[in-house]
Amino acid sequence: MSDLIAVVETGAYLAKATRIMSEAERSQVVDVVAARPDAGVVLVGSSGLRKLRIRLAGRGKSGGARLVYWYHSPGFPAVLLWVFAKNEADNLTAAQLKRLVGEAEWLIEDFGGKR
């Protein structure tokens, strides 16, 4: 088994996650990302943002959520930035993506990584 990486839950992520997920579901998300930080699909042109599908209990096939997080490479934490229920939107809006890309670029600079 590989080493787990650190996972950071941002305030924006937590505010939304506590409204749409149970504590157990939130904990499971952290566990999955810690074990497999590269599991999400990289969003093109997003400075490394990833999107991961999440199942939410008792909500049926279309009742899941989408997690948006940043992961650069080994030695860096994964940062959970945003989550939204599938019934709210299929994807991020252009404005949301732009804001999250700005956050990812700040994280890259802050952690000393290269784009």
What are these regions (language model features)?
Residues 23-26, 62, 97:
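Amphipathic alpha-helical transducer elements in NTP-driven molecular machines
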Residues 16, 32, 103, 107:
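Residues that form generic nucleotide/phosphate-binding pockets
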Residues 1, 14, 35-37, 85, ...:
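Preference for short coil/turn "hinge" residues that link or interrupt alpha-helices
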